[in-house]
Regions:
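Structural beta-sheet core signal
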Residues: 57, 80, 115-117
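Conserved C-terminal guanine-recognition region of P-loop GTPase G domains, centered on the G4
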Residues: 92-110
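Hydrophobic "anchor" residues on beta-strands that sit immediately upstream
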Residues: 54, 72, 114
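Inter-motif core of Ras-like GTPase G domains
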Residues: 50, 66-86
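Beta-strand-loop-alpha "switch" segments that mediate conformational coupling across diverse proteins
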Residues: 120-161
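P-loop/Walker-type NTP enzyme "switch/lid" segment
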Residues: 1-56, 61-62
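Catalytic P-loop NTPase motifs of RecA-like helicase/translocase cores
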Residues: 6-9, 62-64, 88, 102, ...
Length: 161
C-alpha cells in the first residue's frame, strides 16, 4: 500500500509492470489517498480482519498528515528507517515520541517498532562515529527491534525476475 501523497513506490511498480510485461510479479502495490481518516480506518479494519499475509505500507514522513493515526494504531509493526546522521536521529526520536503518545492515548494499540538503518556503508566512519552508531542502536533497542545493518548504496534495490 502506498499511502504517501507522492506515490513513489506505486509509480516505481508501474514502471516494473511495463518493463517486465507478461511476467507475474510477486506482489502488487496499490495507491490509497489517506485524507479521509474514516476511509483509512474502515479500509485497514477490513484488511486486518479479512486478509491473511503481510501488507507493507509506505506512509508520508510528515506527522501532521491526515489519516496517519489509524494506520499506526492498526499496524502490528512499524518499520522505521533511519540514517546515522543528526537530523535523521532527531526525526526518529520525534517519531518514537509521537508513537509513544499515540499508544498512551490508544491502549489497544500494540504496534512494535523495527528500526532499519538506511544507506549504511561499512567503509565509512571513524572510531568515535562507530561507537556513537553502536550507542544509537543500543538506545533504539529500548523501543523496538533493531534490524542488522545491511550495506547499501542508497536508492532502490534491483530485483531480477
Amino acid at each position: 500500500m502506498d499511502f504517501d501523497r507522492q506515490q513513489t513506490i506505486f509509480s516505481k511498480r508501474q514502471e516494473d509492470i511495463g518493463k517486465y510485461e507478461g511476467v507475474r510479479l510477486p506482489y502488487t502495490v496499490q495507491p490509497f489517498d489517506i485524507k479521509n481518516t474514516n476511509n483509512v480506518r474502515e479500509f485497514l479494519t477490513n484488511l486486518r480482519n479479512g486478509y491473511k499475509g503481510f501488507v507493507l505500507m509506505d506512509t508520508p514522513g510528515n506527522l501532521s498528515q491526515q489519516g496517519l493515526v489509524p494506520i499506526f494504531a492498526l499496524s502490528h509493526y512499524i518499520v522505521c528507517p533511519y540514517q546515522f546522521e543528526a537530523t535523521s536521529i532527531s526525526s526518529t526520536a520525534t517519531f518514537i515520541g509521537f508513537i509513544a503518545k499515540l499508544q498512551h492515548m490508544l491502549p489497544v494499540m500494540k504496534s512494535r517498532f523495527i528500526f532499519v538503518v538506511n544507506k549504511w556503508d561499512k567503509r565509512y566512519g571513524r572510531k568515535a562515529e562507530l561507537e556513537l552508531w553502536d550507542k544509537t542502536e543500543e538506545r533504539l533497542r529500548h523501543f523496538g527491534l533493531v534490524a542488522p545493518r545491511i550495506e547499501g548504496q542508497g536508492g532502490y534495490a534491483t530485483v531480477q525476475y
